[in-house]
A protein has these predicted regions:
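Small/polar-residue-rich loop-to-helix segments that shape phosphate-bearing ligand pockets
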Residues: 88-166, 224-248
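Glycine-rich phosphate/pyrophosphate-binding loop at beta-loop-alpha junctions
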Residues: 149-226, 279-284
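A short, small-residue-rich loop immediately preceding and capping a beta-strand
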Residues: 52-71, 77-86, 169-176
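Alpha-helix C-terminal capping segments
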Residues: 45-50, 68-80, 184-191, 260-267
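Active-site-adjacent helical/loop segments in soluble small-molecule enzymes
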Residues: 224-269, 275-279
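Gly/Ser/Thr-rich loops at beta-strand to alpha-helix junctions
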Residues: 60-68, 90-91, 172-182, 253-257, ...
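Positively charged, low-complexity intrinsically disordered leader regions
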Residues: 1-54
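Active-site-proximal loop->helix
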Residues: 45, 68-115, 206-217
Length: 284
């Protein structure tokens, strides 16, 4: 994978009165395939480690794009890929778009536990013989921030270069926290004056991780944290559909953030909405 593809600067577009950072337009695998900032992070990680391993292993929710992202990346670098799931059945996996897409990219799917909890699956992954023999590398939820912090955060921060120098509101979906950390570090690095950063959480509380990591880089700052994850009735697995000016937002992430934005009182003309990625269509 050449450097130009890995570091492509995605555009900022004005659509129906609001600015969007279009990380969903990072599509090195082609239209409709896995895409976005999380794919770039995974590809940069595997670009760094692929000469030392024969394959990769990941474990995640049956609804998470991490499985097909990891599988597609492994295929691009000529590596094997194994995906560990838990708490499901083979017939269920054959019906769900993310496992199906991972299999289409060549992943070996294993139902490794009765529970789908990430800590249980990670425990099992660590004890795989190929992992113990250092033939396979485990790609974690959050794409291995602790081991490869500089390269991953630097890649996200670099995407801040082309946003406007002055912004009233930046709205960003927050899951694992890596994209949020990288974007906030980029605001400091590229001297962007963003008056209000709104992190809209679709996962567990990452504020401690975000602040501690940014402090190491001298880039810590205040932000508004909006917790959807613990809101009554919220479900990560339940899709929500939203379209803005022809942009179909990811039903598990940005679509839910857009629903929050619609009720927030923020004005579109004062806001940049960061899209981390789009739902891949190839697995449907």
């Amino acid at each position: 994978m050449n450097s130009e593809k890995l570091h492509y600067l995605t555009p900022v577009q004005q659509v129906d009165g609001m600015l969007f950072k279009r990380e969903d337009l990072y599509t090195p695998m082609g239209a409709g395939e896995v895409n976005g900032g999380k794919l770039r992070q995974c590809m940069l990680l595997v670009d760094k480690i692929h000469r030392d391993y024969e394959g990769v292993v990941t474990c995640c929710s049956i609804h998470s794009p991490q499985a097909p992202i990891t599988a597609a990346t492994a295929k691009a670098f000529g590596l094997k890929c194994q995906v560990l799931y838990g708490g499901t059945k083979p017939e269920t996996l054959r019906q769900l778009p993310m496992p199906r897409l991972a299999m289409r990219y060549g992943a070996q799917i294993t139902i490794a536990a009765k529970s789908g909890r990430s800590n249980i699956l990670y425990y099992i992954a660590q004890r795989l013989q190929r992992v113990k023999d250092k033939r396979d590398y485990i790609i974690l939820y959050g794409i291995n921030l602790q081991e490869h912090e500089d390269i991953l955060l630097g890649a996200v921060a670099a995407q801040v270069r082309n946003i406007p120098d002055e912004i009233d509101n930046l709205v960003l979906t927050c899951g694992s926290g890596i994209t949020a950390i990288g974007v906030l570090a980029g605001l400091k690095q590229y001297h962007k004056n963003v008056r209000n950063v709104h992190l809209v959480a679709t996962g567990p509380d990452r504020r401690k991780l975000i602040h501690e990591t940014l402090q190491k880089y001298g880039a810590d700052r205040q932000f508004h944290y909006h917790d959807l994850f613990h809101t009554r009735g919220f479900s990560y697995e339940e899709p929500f559909y939203s379209v803005w000016g022809g942009i179909k937002l990811h039903p598990n992430y940005e679509a839910k953030t857009m629903a929050w934005f619609a009720k927030s009182g923020l004005r579109p003309e004062d806001t940049l909405f960061w899209i981390t990625g789009a739902e891949p269509l190839a697995g449907k």
